[in-house]
């Protein structure tokens, strides 16, 4: 029995070797030239298995992308390319609607250089100045539309259009305008405007329609003391009891000696 088993194993091994040898020598798997059946590991490592170049390789690569070729090798099903069907309603093209597309690039680029930062800061300053000018013009236009008017009522803070304007804009019902505040706190004396004086006849020209400056009618008294310029004396100024003592003329009886030094008063 043991002898029969060894013979069967030997026959199976021979059959397997013949099958492998026949498969290697078929036309689909030709043996490369210069390759013997008994090849060493070094010879198998240097074996050139590239084969001949395919003339249609570039054309195929140009038609099909790498993803499609890889999917074909891996057996992955690729979705069919969209192909428009026949036009509906005849050969006329459908009416297309315009669409706005955002073509702005939101990616962060390289940091700006020093010159670009200077230009950017200048542009930013000009933009802020333009915005401030526009805001000021808009505020002035709003003020003109609100029609602010200065008012002076008989009772400060009551029935005043200026106070009503400030109360409406600020939202505070107890606020007063500047004029009513000064009048209410007696900071200044306000009185009604007096009537204009009648025009006096002009004494310099024959035209009586134009007024002349008022005439001085009050004559000063004869004994009115007048200030007299007095030179500074080297001595100490004497004490006085009233202002009249300073403006009285002092009689100079002794001549001044200019050769002497001025005495210092302690």
From Swiss-Prot:
UniProt KW keywords: Activator, Early protein, G1/S host cell cycle checkpoint dysregulation by virus, Host nucleus, Host-virus interaction, Inhibition of host innate immune response by virus, Inhibition of host interferon signaling pathway by virus, Inhibition of host STAT1 by virus, Interferon antiviral system evasion, Metal-binding, Modulation of host cell cycle by virus, Transcription, Transcription regulation, Viral immunoevasion, Zinc, Zinc-finger
Keyword Zinc: yes
Region entry Disordered, spans: 193-244
Motif (Nuclear localization signal) on chain: 261-265
Cellular component GO terms held in the UniProt record: host cell nucleus
Pfam families: Adeno_E1A
Motif interval(s): PXDLS motif, CTBP-binding: 255-259
Region Interaction with RB1 in competition with E2F1: start-end pairs: 39-47
Function of the protein: Plays a role in viral genome replication by driving entry of quiescent cells into the cell cycle. Stimulation of progression from G1 to S phase allows the virus to efficiently use the cellular DNA replicating machinery to achieve viral genome replication. E1A protein has both transforming and trans-activating activities. Induces the disassembly of the E2F1 transcription factor from RB1 by direct competition for the same binding site on RB1, with subsequent transcriptional activation of E2F1-regulated S-phase genes and of the E2 region of the adenoviral genome.
Family designation: Belongs to the adenoviridae E1A protein family.
Identification of the protein by name: Early E1A protein
Organism: Simian adenovirus serotype 7
Taxonomic lineage of the native organism: Viruses, Varidnaviria, Bamfordvirae, Preplasmiviricota, Tectiliviricetes
